[in-house]
Amino acid sequence: MKFTIKDVFLVLAVMITSMTSFKSYSQDAHQMWLEGSKGKLYALLQYPDEVKKDVKYPLVIICHGFSGNCESEMQKDLADDIVRNGMAALRFDFNGHGKSEGLFQDMTVPNEIEDLKDVIKWAQKQPWVESIGLVGHSQGGVVVSMVAGELGNKIIKAEALMAPAAVLRDDALRGSTMGAYYDPYNIQGDYVELPGSPEAGSLKLGKAYIETAMTLPIYETARKYTGPTLILQGTHDRVVPYTYAERYHEEIKGSQLKLIEGDNHMFSNSLRQSCQFVANWMKTQLEGWKVINVNI
């Protein structure tokens, strides 16, 4: 089902009429270091203002995409909106990204999966965590979908996939990843040099990343998840064609698919509205009630 950016804005305007004026919670984030697959993971934890002793709260874990980090605008907006909805938000840098330990060259989707599992294990040990939901963007969406498929809905109560990059497997098979071209069956050396960019600079894509991506059972694993699933993507996404979101929708039974007409991979035209939409949706799943019943 497709809806325009204007439609999203109007729906969300209704949803948040009872909310107070905008307040950024990012400055209140608690810096943490958690164990991961390649060393320490840098993380930021935010609580609702009204956090109380001996009270449990839903926790939403947010996963960034390929070459991203937990301090990007999207990650901050998601965390702030989640906290404003009375839940806790934990965002972290995958190994080899941002401030976390490890080399980008050694990063693979399988070891990012292990990173997320390690973060979830930490969350399960916290006495204040009532339930766990996952949000992932791009490659982070693939990681979220596979972890949810592996752990099931007894542990992961809901997942939201924002422009999930299942295309990464096809990219590896055809030898084209983020502007770099290579022979996937005859990689020279230990890595492929990615074109430089203002955001990421020059990065080395490890041979292990390509080899594991080529056989990654993305949909086979993701379809095992039977809990609530939201899939959100723009129809003008040039990084991941929205047909991959449609495939996710077909594979994960009972999932909700929302296509934003004209938006891109980073949700540039609707970032605030999209983050609010995801946070509101997650609240309804983790707290068991809806702010307002709206069919889009």
Which ranges hold each PLM region?
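N-terminal cap/lid segment of alpha/beta-hydrolase-fold proteins
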Residues: 25-55
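The alpha/beta-hydrolase serine catalytic core
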Residues: 31, 41, 142, 149, ...
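Catalytic nucleophile-loop/oxyanion-hole region of alpha/beta-hydrolase
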Residues: 34, 70-71, 97-128
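Short beta-strand element of the alpha/beta-hydrolase
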Residues: 55-65
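The serine-hydrolase catalytic nucleophile loop
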Residues: 67-79, 94
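Conserved alpha/beta-hydrolase
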Residues: 79-101
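Alpha/beta-hydrolase fold nucleophile elbow
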Residues: 127-138
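Glycine-rich nucleophile elbow surrounding the catalytic serine of serine-hydrolase chemistry
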Residues: 136-146
